[in-house]
Amino acid sequence: MEKLETGRQPQNTQQAGSRISIIGMVQTAIFGAIIIIMAFTPFLGYIPLGFTRATILHVPVIIASLLMGPKKGGVLGFLFGLTSFINNTMNPTATSFVFTPFYSVGEVSGGIGSLIICFVPRILVGILPFYVYKLAMYFRSKRGKSGVSNAGLILAGVTGSLVNTLLVMNLIFVFFREGYAAANDVAVSAVYTFILSIIGINGVPEAIVAGVLTLCIGRVLMKKNIRERLGFRNDLGY
């Protein structure tokens, strides 16, 4: 009897691992569907502002990072970047060449820099918020407190949003300053000032919205009993 029980244990462990893996894939697919629906619904995921687009697509990526961890968050961040790539290729604005190599304005065209701008910041949106929240929880536990950290949720949301905005805009300056200046009818010498104005006009409100939404949604979904009921495993250690 003892041998039989011992033989069953690895099989049970394997079945449990497979079940967790399937649940993880389903959860990732659900968040992926949310991102795709938002991305391709007019004025929802991407909001046209003439020369550029504002976005709140980073919010589900941030929430996914907190609930499922940085690996799945990074995958969903890549999906965020892919929707941006498709949107800017199929429905371009004057500056879409910074997000896709398949669009040009006059003599200005995209290239490898476009792919870096389109994907790298968005992947990081799915990774960094997890560690920001984990750090907030570490300091919270040091003070003898438990439960969801409101400050951590806000910081995670703001960080994810600012990582996207600051990296995208600064990489535009690195790779496409002349083309970006020409597309916006701005002198090359003044293009970074123009970029800073976009960060202020678009980036700051986006960060505030991301912080508020991450707090409101996270306060519900990050509670231990809710996470366990929904099957989320994020390795935050609480």
Regions flagged by a language model, labelled:
Residues M1-Y238:
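Loop-helix junctions at membrane interfaces
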